[in-house]
Amino acid sequence: MRVVILGSGVVGVTSAWYLSQAGHDVTVIDREPGPALETSAANAGQISPGYAAPWAAPGVPLKAIKWMFQRHAPLAVRLDGTQFQLKWMWQMLRNCDTSHYMENKGRMVRLAEYSRDCLKELRAATGIEYEGRQGGTLQLFRTEQQFENATRDIAVLEDAGVPYQLLESNRLAEVEPALAAVAHKLTGGLRLPNDETGDCQLFTQRLAQMAEQAGVKFRFNTPVDKLLFEGEQIYGVKCGDEVIKADAYVMAFGSYSTAMLKGIVDIPVYPLKGYSLTIPVANEDGAPVSTILDETYKIAITRFDNRIRVGGMAEIVGFNTELLQPRRETLEMVVRDLYPRGGHIEQATFWTGLRPMTPDGTPVVGRTSFKNLWLNTGHGTLGWTMACGSGQLLSDILSGRTPAIPYDDLSVARYSSGFSPARPRHLHGVHN
């Protein structure tokens, strides 16, 4: 089958890889000159299935009000003048109760755990290298309340069979030695030993090279004007004066998917602006070993080979990509506070990207009401974590194979009234 994929970020390229491996004739189209040059370029670097959780959580509405008056707030909102933004925020608020949070987190963890398994298999099969580490991740708590709240997330981890360790502050240095000097500032941490890290852009670029060698065609520097359709079927992609045709079409345009699908399929994917710093390592003993997540500021600090990636925050501000100095100051503040000797902060590279977010936090993966249109978008801050699993899942569905995990509650149909997904089975695993 001829398949056209729109988008060459990590989700688009993994989709291309798995579809090609399934025997399809795949073409990837992107406006950029190469893969992973937008949202996948400089994310936080975490592959953290256990921390997969929606921003829509109990207490967030009240916290959002408090954050409006804080200098280093993890979430900021600025109206962009569109009804879509208001509708999206209302939908997000409706998902902030405990019941929705547990449901959404459960399916996010399910896909993320599966995705990590797919990444392991891909790494074993291809030998792909991307400055990856398999040292686990550590969520850091600064208050007793945060430590107590971790029990809520642990219930979801146990249900999914995800290994974890709940550590008091005096044990944090066992997994991240440099934290010994700042342990007095912390109340503890939640460690997920099976989580990983890696450079998402490097992974995507190298997988794109492998995919091209396997026969995937990449059409870079090719802006897409619109999808052409008749009835309930897509019959082409209009790119300037050219119409590119295929048997099936996959939308993986991230935050730009919503506008491209206007009048075809209604999806609630909105850009969630985030920032990162990439810092050269200055002191091996003072740098992170793997990756940590600061629960207070929602900022991740991740170790690559000779670099430290500091990423996080969320701004609901539309398609604004301005680099704001106060956001850089927040990233610098957190990394100086936890790893004061770790990196040459004065040499850091500052970056921003637009994460494609759904109001319930779960991506949109699978078929649509159109016979030959498929979606793989809306992964929010977890595109790197969920990419391989989403790509394999999409390939299985499109190819008519039975996927390894339940998937009906990942489709766009879940936003329809009366939708009732099948209950997912437990994932294998143990906890301690």
Curated annotation (Swiss-Prot):
Species whose genome carries this gene: Escherichia fergusonii (strain ATCC 35469 / DSM 13698 / CCUG 18766 / IAM 14443 / JCM 21226 / LMG 7866 / NBRC 102419 / NCTC 12128 / CDC 0568-73)
Catalytic activity, as annotated: a D-alpha-amino acid + A + H2O = a 2-oxocarboxylate + AH2 + NH4(+)
Species classification: Bacteria, Pseudomonadati, Pseudomonadota, Gammaproteobacteria, Enterobacterales
Pathway(s) served: Amino-acid degradation; D-alanine degradation; NH(3) and pyruvate from D-alanine: step 1/1
Residues the record lists as binding FAD: 3-17
One function term, GO molecular function aspect: D-amino-acid dehydrogenase activity
GO biological process: D-alanine catabolic process
Highest taxon above the source species: Bacteria
Cofactor (UniProt): FAD
EC number in record: 1.4.99.-
Major enzyme class: oxidoreductase
Primary gene name: dadA
Function: Oxidative deamination of D-amino acids.
Protein's name according to its UniProt entry: D-amino acid dehydrogenase
